[in-house]
Structure formats: structure tokens, C-alpha cells
């Protein structure tokens, strides 16, 4: 069997405690279930420094537990190196996209393709809204969007 090149994806949201760790965990489960996890480097990060060092929001952890998806992450902020080392940087909303495009312009070599994760949604829900000020059902909505988008992204990038 031919050796497959490793691809990499970084999921990004504002604080890296709600949406992006859910997307990261969902994508890890997808590539693990398809036995291609060794072909992917997967991580998540924040555009802001608000939550650095914190675990994912407990409501997101509960949601993932209900779906049987392991989730372990410590919030971190995106770095200049991330723009040079990841193939894809997928974010959740227009504000993230603006911040990432601005930050990428400060990097000499940006190899990452920066996109909205929602651009892969077959249901055309472009924005994955921040559930931080919401309730459990808002986290479930984020989870469902991430599942749809990550599946579609994996099919396209695979």
C-alpha cells in the first residue's frame, strides 16, 4: 500500500473552548473511524487570548459525551507558525475569518487555505454561531453543524 501524505487541519473560533474543540473532536472521530487518522494532523486554536489554558466549556464536553466522542483539549491561541504549517485553517464565523486573514497577512509564508467550516455544509448554514451565551440545545446545534461540515470537508480533502 502506498504511503499517503499527511494533511493538516486547524479548527479556529474566538476562544477555543466551544466551537473549535467540538469540530476538532468530531473530525478526529471521523478520521479514526475511517482508519486514516495517521494521515491527518488535527488541532484547534483561538483567535483571541481570552481562554488560553482552559479546558473546553463543560456544556460542550457534555454534548460530546452524549454522542460518545472523546474530547480533550486545552485552549491555545493561533500562532504565526500555524499559518505556515497547516494545510487548512477552518473557522466558524465572519469575525474569525477577518481576524485570520488579517493575521495571515503578517506572516511571510502562509500555506494554509483559510475558510469558513460552514462553507462545506450541505445544508448551506455558512455560520456556526457561538453557543457560549446559549444553552445545551445551542451546543447540540454546533455539534450537528460540525458533523455535517467535517464529513463534507473530509470527502473533499481526502
From Swiss-Prot:
Gene Ontology cellular component list: cytoplasm; cytoplasmic side of plasma membrane; cytosol; extracellular exosome; sarcolemma; synapse
Pfam families attached to this UniProt entry: LMWPc
Regulation: Inhibited by sulfhydryl reagents.
Entry EC no(s): 3.1.3.48, 3.1.3.2
Location within or outside the cell: Cytoplasm
Major enzyme class: hydrolase
Entry's Gene Ontology molecular function annotations: acid phosphatase activity; non-membrane spanning protein tyrosine phosphatase activity; protein tyrosine phosphatase activity; SH3 domain binding
Superkingdom of origin: Eukaryota
Post-translational modification Phosphotyrosine, affected residues: 132-133
Keywords assigned: Acetylation, Cytoplasm, Hydrolase, Phosphoprotein, Protein phosphatase
Any one GO BP annotation for this protein: chemical synaptic transmission
Signal sequence, start to end: none
Positions carrying N-acetylalanine: 2
Family in the record: Belongs to the low molecular weight phosphotyrosine protein phosphatase family.
Subunit annotation: Interacts with EPHA2; dephosphorylates EPHA2. Interacts with EPHB1.
Function: Acts on tyrosine phosphorylated proteins, low-MW aryl phosphates and natural and synthetic acyl phosphates with differences in substrate specificity between isoform 1 and isoform 2.
Name of the featured protein: Low molecular weight phosphotyrosine protein phosphatase
Source organism of the structure: Homo sapiens (Human)
Amino acid at each position: 500500500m502506498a504511503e499517503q501524505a499527511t494533511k493538516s487541519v486547524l479548527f479556529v473560533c474566538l476562544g477555543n473552548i466551544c466551537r473549535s474543540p467540538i469540530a476538532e473532536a468530531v473530525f478526529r472521530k471521523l478520521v479514526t473511524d475511517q482508519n486514516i487518522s495517521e494521515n491527518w494532523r488535527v488541532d484547534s486554536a483561538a483567535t483571541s487570548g481570552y481562554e488560553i489554558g482552559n479546558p473546553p466549556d463543560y456544556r460542550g464536553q457534555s454534548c460530546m459525551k452524549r454522542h460518545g466522542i472523546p474530547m480533550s483539549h486545552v485552549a491555545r491561541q493561533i500562532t504565526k507558525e500555524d499559518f505556515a504549517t497547516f494545510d487548512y485553517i477552518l473557522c466558524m464565523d465572519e469575525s474569525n475569518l477577518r481576524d485570520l486573514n488579517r493575521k495571515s497577512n503578517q506572516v511571510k509564508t502562509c500555506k494554509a487555505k483559510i475558510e469558513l467550516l460552514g462553507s462545506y455544509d450541505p445544508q448551506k448554514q455558512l455560520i456556526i454561531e457561538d453557543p457560549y451565551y446559549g444553552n445545551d440545545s445551542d451546543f447540540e446545534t454546533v455539534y450537528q453543524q460540525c458533523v455535517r461540515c467535517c464529513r463534507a470537508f473530509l470527502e473533499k480533502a481526502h
